Amino acid sequence: MLKKFPHQLSGGECQRAAIARAISIKPRLLICDEITSALDVQTQAEIIQLLLKLQAETKMSLLFISHDITIVQEICQRILIMQSGTIIESGPALDIITRPQQHYTRELVTAAFNLTKI
């Protein structure tokens, strides 16, 4: 990777380089804004595992911003659901996924976990 030009890097390599750059200053909080959105499923899993490993080793907090609720519910302890820039629901990940209170959240969860209804 060190001998490649930026345009020669894969999406996963670019993400790993961005993560390395971000954690080089030893942040207490790493904001991951759509960090896996342009990656294939295998590379998504590798990036998530890398972040969770780094979190465990450094005790840094991770803030995931994502439209992919299937990934979010797997890795986050708490979820905030936003609609039009406003937080409409928040709570433990399992509660939000299994017992959504807001209509928008129910639609989001249904779309993510029950593709046959689309």
Pin down the residues of each PLM region.
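Conserved ABC ATPase signature
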Residues: 5-9, 13
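Hydrophobic anchor residue at the start of the ABC signature
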Residues: 19, 47
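A short, proline-enriched helix->beta-strand linker immediately N-terminal to the Walker B motif
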Residues: 24-28
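A short, surface-exposed alpha-helical micro-motif characterized by mixed small hydrophobic
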Residues: 72-74
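ABC ATPase "signature
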Residues: 90-91
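C-terminal boundary and immediately downstream tail of ABC-type ATPase nucleotide-binding domains
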Residues: 98-118
